[in-house]
From Swiss-Prot:
EC category name: transferase
Gene expressing this chain: selA
Catalytic reaction(s) noted: L-seryl-tRNA(Sec) + selenophosphate + H(+) = L-selenocysteinyl-tRNA(Sec) + phosphate
Taxonomic path: Bacteria, Bacillati, Bacillota, Clostridia, Eubacteriales
Name of the protein in its database record: L-seryl-tRNA(Sec) selenium transferase
Xref: HAMAP family: SelA
The entry's keywords: Cytoplasm, Protein biosynthesis, Pyridoxal phosphate, Selenium, Transferase
Length: 462
């Protein structure tokens, strides 16, 4: 059949509305939703005809596509996915998972009225920051603290407060890109601080900072390169040295440590990453870090440091534009409470638990997943292998975590096709593919995911 005839054969919406099955959906759903879904189905077949992808179709084909489209339109676009990649803080999959305590606090606060900005003791307007400030101070040792909606906002607010229209001196080797083309120089530009680059990419000395200090200098800035490492012939100025220099010239020292861990991971066999507490102990005046990376909480930009600087930031007009909402505050409060006891934090915060859980535990879990798949899914080969997980989220660059995975292949379907079908399934499963094998890393899987994975694998060859 020629293209013009195929286009003429496309059914009209009014015609499809008379179909019994469509009419049944019309009784259960709004007319607008049904009509829009019918239009999408017709448009789909029109597009396929114009691209010469089909040479025939039936009204039943159009109706079946309409049913799938309707169900897709009814479902939320923001979906739960299963992370089988082994990347713990997966930026594209939502970064850190919340602790049970954080989730319960969010539910309690979001389904009820709350004292968000109300002082119950005094019976008058209060501050939203008061709900977490004392907790942050307790777990970090800071004089004062406040929270905004992400770490880029925290850096921008701090720089705008400390050195608007003045100079911020920073090492050239620390002008990082934090993802999505967001770069420290650009954040500084919008903060209205003037960037002064010193040193070279691989080596910066204390005199590089001192030689550039003048009457217009507002802050000495240190940025932790949490998402990359420079190896070899390198030199950087320590926080202690910068604090001494800042004291000499009466300048505040600010440090953005990015991922913002409160746990010293070197105690557990990892490469040392600066903690928030260590930066403050060295005398840094203002420290900024993320809430949804190594902290294991919600997206937030946390600012800690000297009270005189934090108080100025709270009064900055930018603060209202960057302020944190009640649900994020609730999640952050629940997360921070876990940190009162480090052991409890590691046990209850999923991000920490996944990173620090032993390889032996995951060997047993991988074997369980393999058995379930072998017992329920035909025409696939499954094997347990040693592999490496990643921390992710621009944290601990180069660090790999020994793990166990289930590797999958089949003579009847390619690994790339398995990956695609799992990703597009009703319960999206995100996997890795290597050497024509699909890799399921159990480090980032929960036991509750295993049955879903088995069910989705059973559908792959249908």
């Amino acid at each position: 059949m020629d293209k013009k005839q195929l286009l003429r054969n496309l059914p009209k919406i009014d015609e499809l509305l008379k179909e019994e099955i469509v009419n049944r959906y019309l009784q259960e759903n709004s007319r607008t939703l049904v009509v829009d879904s019918l239009r999408q189905s017709i448009d789909h077949y029109r597009g396929e005809i114009l691209k010469n992808n089909i040479d025939s179709f039936t009204k039943e084909n159009v109706v079946n596509y309409f049913i799938d489209t309707l169900e897709e339109n009814k479902s939320t676009k923001f979906k739960k996915v299963i992370n089988a990649t082994g990347v713990v803080i997966h930026t594209n999959l939502g970064r850190s998972l919340l602790a049970k305590e954080a989730i319960e606090n969010v539910v309690k606060i979001s389904e009820n009225y709350s004292n968000l900005e109300y002082d119950l003791k005094e019976g008058k307007r209060g501050s939203r920051y008061s709900h977490v400030e004392e907790l942050i101070k307790k777990v970090t040792g800071a004089e004062a603290a406040m929270v905004v909606n992400n770490n880029a906002a925290a850096v921008m607010l701090a720089l705008n407060t400390l050195c608007e229209e003045r100079e911020a001196i920073v090492s050239r080797g620390q002008l990082v890109e934090i993802g999505g083309s967001f770069r420290v120089p650009d954040v500084m530009k919008f903060s209205r601080a003037h960037l002064v680059e010193v040193g070279t990419t691989n080596r910066t000395h204390l005199y590089d900072y001192e030689n550039n200090i003048n009457e217009n200098t507002g802050v000495l800035l240190k940025v932790h390169t949490s998402n990359f490492k420079i190896m070899g012939f390198t030199e950087e100025v320590s926080s202690e040295e910068m604090v001494q220099l800042g004291g000499k010239y009466k300048l505040p020292v600010m440090e953005d440590i990015g991922s913002g861990t409160l746990v010293d991971f070197s105690k557990y066999g990892f490469t040392y990453e600066p903690t928030v507490q260590s930066s403050l102990e060295k005398g840094v005046d203002v420290v900024t870090f993320s809430g949804d990376k190594m902290l294991g909480g919600p997206q937030a930009g946390i600012i800690v440091g000297k009270k005189k600087y934090i108080d100025k930031m709270k009064k900055n007009q930018l603060t209202r534009a960057l302020r944190i909402d009640k649900m994020t505050l609730a999640a952050l409060e629940g997360t921070l409470k876990c940190y009162i006891d480090e052991k409890e934090a590691i046990e209850n915060i999923p991000t920490l638990n996944m990173i620090l859980s032993s390889k032996d535990i995951h060997k047993k879990r991988a074997q369980r997943l393999k058995r379930r798949l072998q017992n329920n899914v035909k025409d696939f080969n499954f094997k347990v292998s040693e592999d490496l997980s990643m921390v992710g989220g621009g944290s601990m660059p180069g660090e790999r975590i020994p793990t166990y995975v289930v590797k999958v292949n089949s003579d009847k379907i390619t690994a790339e096709k398995i990956e695609e079908k799992l990703r597009l399934s009703k319960n999206p499963i995100i996997v890795r593919v290597s050497k024509d094998e699909v890799i399921l890393d159990v480090r980032t899987l929960f036991e509750r995911d295993f049955n879903i994975i088995v069910e989705e694998f059973k559908k792959l060859l249908k």
